[in-house]
């Protein structure tokens, strides 16, 4: 693990070249480094000052805006410096060379600035994960989910629950220790378990949205399945707006699973084109069919495609009806099928029915995640810890015949599980994984 006593630096802005590049320095020697680079006293805290950045020969490297953030009022909680320079590779290389030459400074590892912010109490683990998701957000709903998490709204909810568990335990301890005292009202036990029953209901309702956050964050998975030449690859290309899949009249052209991401009104949708499902003696095609079925089974929604002039096989119609839509393709051709057999009719090649399909996809997404609801668990680990919390609270409520001390212990375990979501309880084994999601300089 990197030494948190080191002073670190990195490029914190985007790829070079750029109009402006931002170098961040954090640690005990950050201000010493800035004085060495500028040859002048520090500017006023949190005030942008124009300075000449110089090399060891006192030659000007660049004219830069410099901002200093004294500890603890900085992103990392340490002394921090930001240097806003022109974003050429030559300027950055020269400044980094001077920082290397100063001694006592080193380049930051991926996510190290954010890790220091966490270790210094500037962010909790939920906020760190939210920041990582915000940096990678590609759609409006991903941005909203990440902002609610990174701004502490989800942490506030979980901390509130933890405080209610702590208060319940305190009341139980009071009843255990001072049962004979008049200061402890007889109704304390009733209050505690009524409050815990209410908390159980809130956690349970929150968990109902447990998959919603993962769908928003990781994408709504849509599998295109059907017989060979049903129009799956043509539809994939039409929805993505580019030639992703090879389209021919030869049955079995698609052998492997292809995927493309699209932004559907703020939602990330992952569309999977699969091999045509049919009986075949071809070993490679048979493996493609196996993968097609597996992809469909793990998708959030299955689009079962059938062209106008074919009769669907039983194997195509055996998927979960609750997770599937039947789509008639190639609608400009003559048809043996009734429109009543399908949820949608399209011609991907001609662009017919695609807007209706997009609207149907959005309706399916919002049926799963709710319209605009983003205060939900965003990761599988959040859901796992919440389920643990719910189980412990349930155990405490259901153990009426057990000693109060045992029931109080269940509540302590529930609070511990909540604490592992925010990082209030030891989560050292998680930190390396989480901070590896960050780029250098964040």
Swiss-Prot record:
Residue numbers binding GTP: 229-234, 248-254, 273-276
Enzyme class, UniProt record, top EC level: hydrolase
Every TrmE-type G domain range: 219-366
Intrachain S-S bonds: none
Pfam families attached to this UniProt entry: MMR_HSR1 (PF01926), MnmE_helical (PF12631), TrmE_N (PF10396)
Coiled coil: none
SUPFAM superfamilies reported in the protein's UniProt record: Folate-binding domain, P-loop containing nucleoside triphosphate hydrolases, TrmE connector domain
GO MF annotation terms: GTP binding; GTPase activity; metal ion binding
GO CC, one annotated term: cytoplasm
Binding site for (6S)-5-formyl-5,6,7,8-tetrahydrofolate: 24, 82, 122, 442
Residue positions binding Mg(2+): 233, 254
Cofactor: K(+)
A GO BP annotation: tRNA wobble uridine modification
Binding residues for K(+): 229, 248, 250, 253
Compartmental location: Cytoplasm
Lineage: superkingdom: Bacteria
Record text on cofactor binding: Binds 1 potassium ion per subunit.
Function: Exhibits a very high intrinsic GTPase hydrolysis rate. Involved in the addition of a carboxymethylaminomethyl (cmnm) group at the wobble position (U34) of certain tRNAs, forming tRNA-cmnm(5)s(2)U34.
Family: Belongs to the TRAFAC class TrmE-Era-EngA-EngB-Septin-like GTPase superfamily. TrmE GTPase family.
Assembly and oligomerization: Homodimer. Heterotetramer of two MnmE and two MnmG subunits.
Protein name, as recorded: tRNA modification GTPase MnmE
Species: Agrobacterium fabrum (strain C58 / ATCC 33970) (Agrobacterium tumefaciens (strain C58))
Origin organism lineage: Bacteria, Pseudomonadati, Pseudomonadota, Alphaproteobacteria, Hyphomicrobiales
């Amino acid at each position: 693990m990197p030494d948190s006593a080191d002073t670190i630096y990195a490029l914190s802005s985007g790829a070079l070249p750029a109009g402006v590049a931002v170098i961040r320095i954090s640690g005990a020697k950050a201000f010493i480094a800035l004085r060495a680079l500028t040859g002048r006293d520090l500017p006023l805290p949190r005030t942008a000052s124009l300075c000449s950045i110089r090399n060891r020969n006192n030659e000007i490297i660049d004219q830069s805006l410099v901002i200093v953030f004294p500890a603890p009022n900085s992103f990392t909680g340490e002394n921090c410096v930001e240097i806003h320079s022109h974003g050429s590779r030559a300027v950055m290389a020269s400044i980094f060379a001077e920082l290397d030459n100063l001694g006592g400074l080193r380049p930051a590892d991926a996510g190290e600035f954010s890790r220091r912010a966490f270790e210094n109490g500037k962010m909790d683990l939920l906020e760190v994960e939210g920041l990582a998701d915000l940096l990678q957000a590609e759609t409006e709903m991903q941005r909203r989910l990440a902002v609610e998490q990174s701004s502490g709204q989800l942490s506030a909810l979980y901390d509130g629950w933890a405080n209610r568990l702590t208060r319940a335990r305190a009341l139980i301890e009071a009843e255990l220790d001072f049962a004979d005292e008049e200061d402890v009202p007889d109704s304390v036990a009733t209050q505690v378990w009524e409050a815990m029953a209410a908390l159980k209901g809130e956690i349970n309702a929150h968990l109902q949205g447990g998959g919603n956050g993962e769908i928003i964050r990781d994408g709504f998975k849509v599998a295109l399945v059907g017989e060979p030449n049903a129009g799956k690859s043509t539809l994939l290309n039409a929805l993505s707006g580019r030639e992703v899949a090879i389209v021919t009249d030869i049955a079995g052209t698609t052998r492997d699973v292809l995927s493309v991401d699209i932004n559907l009104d703020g939602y990330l949708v992952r569309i999977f084109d699969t091999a045509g499902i049919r009986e075949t003696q071809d070993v490679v095609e048979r493996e493609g069919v196996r993968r097609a079925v597996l992809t469909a089974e793990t998708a959030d929604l299955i689009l079962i495609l059938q062209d106008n002039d074919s009769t669907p096989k039983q194997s195509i119609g055996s998927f979960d009806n609750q997770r599937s839509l039947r789509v008639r393709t190639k609608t400009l051709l003559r048809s043996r099928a009734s429109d009543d057999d399908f949820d949608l009719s399209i011609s991907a090649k001609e662009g017919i029915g695609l807007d209706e399909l997009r609207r149907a996809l959005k309706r399916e997404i919002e049926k799963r995640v709710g319209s605009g609801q983003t205060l939900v668990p965003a990761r599988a680990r959040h859901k796992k810890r919440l389920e643990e919390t719910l189980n412990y609270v349930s155990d405490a409520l259901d153990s009426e015949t057990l000693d109060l001390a045992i029931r109080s212990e269940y509540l302590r375990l529930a609070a511990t599980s909540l604490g592992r979501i925010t990082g209030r309880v030891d989560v050292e084994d998680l930190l390396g994984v989480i901070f590896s999601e960050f780029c250098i300089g964040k």
